[in-house]
Curated annotation (Swiss-Prot):
The gene is TCRP. Its cofactor is Fe cation. Belongs to the 4HPPD family. This is 4-hydroxyphenylpyruvate dioxygenase. Binds 1 Fe cation per subunit. PROSITE patterns: VOC. Pathway: Amino-acid degradation; L-phenylalanine degradation; acetoacetate and fumarate from L-phenylalanine: step 3/6.
Length: 399
């Protein structure tokens, strides 16, 4: 969690202490059925199974399936035992109870967003000096392929950040996991989805929490404010939000932080906080170099995306002509796929959002392509909000 309002003043962590962030290492989800969740990402989104731990590897209380597409890695973890049985497994008792509590409170969701760093000790010690809440101290895990150092701190809600140093490891994922090489049987019948890496990871906060959380990222991890919009920029007839993008010192890791703003009805941020029962990760943006192929193939695999109205493209065509911007991609193809467009004088952004991945309207995925554009689609926020409000109306939560 972010520090309380009456916490002592923290001194910003110094970039010299923080070394370089290398990017997102992985995103760790707690889910009710990890095997089935992994199958969703494999069949619907073109991920591949890369590692596993469970009963067959000696893990008697929890199972984890690791899937990957490009440099995007998800760990999906589920409990194998009930809370009542937890005491039978002292090594995993605390973890087992934590997973059950997380699932009861939030449903399936992101527990940890892990960053790869050059030196765990430097980043972690700087964070601790500046008031980070420690979940686990620096520890080393090893096997015949070497060792990985890691440490974990808390961020907003019950979400955590694990710092990972991989320089001493040559294995495919992490000690304690069995590597998987079997190709899913459906892959030969389905089009390939080429994704590159995680572009950003968005956290939703409750009312008036955004500034406090952003301050926490600044002072604990040395992040800076990269981009922001307020409720005057992002609003519809019914709802609004505020957003600040926090970035690592070298701008490789970006963590947008959202909060609701006053509107006539419940916004998507309020809906998220209500159903997730607190702050947490709202969506993960996955970067691709060819969004037309990616969306075409994701839709062919059955991934569901939001619908964009015809009027959006009528307006966009006028805006592009006024700007004198010519897209590399065919406009009618983008329109047929519901791909959103944003631009400035330097370049443009193409993006589209899936529908929620779970029955609870909480987490979803963004597919994004950047063409010399470092923004976050502010020009599309209204269209996105209106699309989500149509879904909210169907759920009866636009109240």
């Amino acid at each position: 969690m972010a520090p309380a309002a009456d916490s002592p003043t923290l001194q910003p962590a110094q970039p010299s202490d923080l070394n370089q962030y290398r990017g997102y290492d992985h995103v760790h989800w707690y889910v009710g059925n990890a095997k089935q969740a992994a199958t969703y990402y494999v069949t619907r989104m073109g991920f591949e199974r890369v590692a596993y731990r469970g009963l067959e590897t000696g893990s008697k209380a929890v199972a984890s399936h690791v899937v990957r597409n490009g440099n995007i890695t998800f760990i999906l973890t589920s409990p194998l035992r009930s809370v009542e049985q937890a005491s039978r497994f002292p090594e995993d008792e605390a973890l087992l109870k934590e997973i059950h509590a997380h699932l009861e409170r939030h449903g399936d969701g992101v527990k940890d967003v892990a960053f790869e760093v050059d030196c765990v000790e430097s980043v972690f010690s700087a964070a601790v000096r500046n008031g980070a809440e420690v979940v686990s101290d620096v520890r080393t895990v090893e096997d015949e392929d070497g060792q990985i150092k890691m440490a974990t701190i808390r961020t907003y809600g019950e979400t955590t950040h694990t710092l990972i140093e991989r320089s001493g490891y040559r294995g495919g994922f992490m000690p304690g996991y069995r590597m998987e090489s079997n190709v899913d049987a459906t892959s030969k019948f389905l089009p390939k989805v080429v994704l590159e890496r995680i572009d950003h990871c968005v956290g939703n906060q409750d009312w008036d929490e955004m500034e406090r959380v952003c301050d926490y990222y600044e002072k604990i991890l040395g992040f800076h404010r990269f981009w922001s919009v307020d409720d005057k920029d992002i609003c519809t007839e019914f709802s609004a939000l505020k957003s600040i993008v926090m970035a690592s010192p070298n701008d490789i890791v970006k963590m947008p932080i959202n909060e609701p703003a006053k509107g006539k009805k419940q916004s998507q941020i309020e809906e998220y906080v209500d159903f997730y029962n607190g702050a947490g990760v709202q969506h993960i943006a996955l970067r691709t170099n060819n969004i037309i192929d990616a969306i075409t193939n994701l839709k062919a695999r059955g991934t569901e995306f939001i619908k964009v109205p015809e009027t959006y493209y009528e307006d966009m065509k006028i805006r592009l002509k006024r700007q004198g911007l010519v897209l590399d991609e065919d406009f009618e193809t983008l329109k047929s796929l519901d791909i959103l467009i944003d631009f400035d004088e330097n370049g443009y952004l193409l993006q589209l959002f899936t529908k929620h991945l779970m029955d609870r309207p909480t987490v979803f995925i963004e597919i994004i392509q950047r063409n010399n554009f470092s923004g976050f689609g502010a020009g599309n926020f209204r269209a996105l909000f209106e699309a989500i409000e149509r879904e909210q109306a169907l759920r009866g939560t636009l109240i």
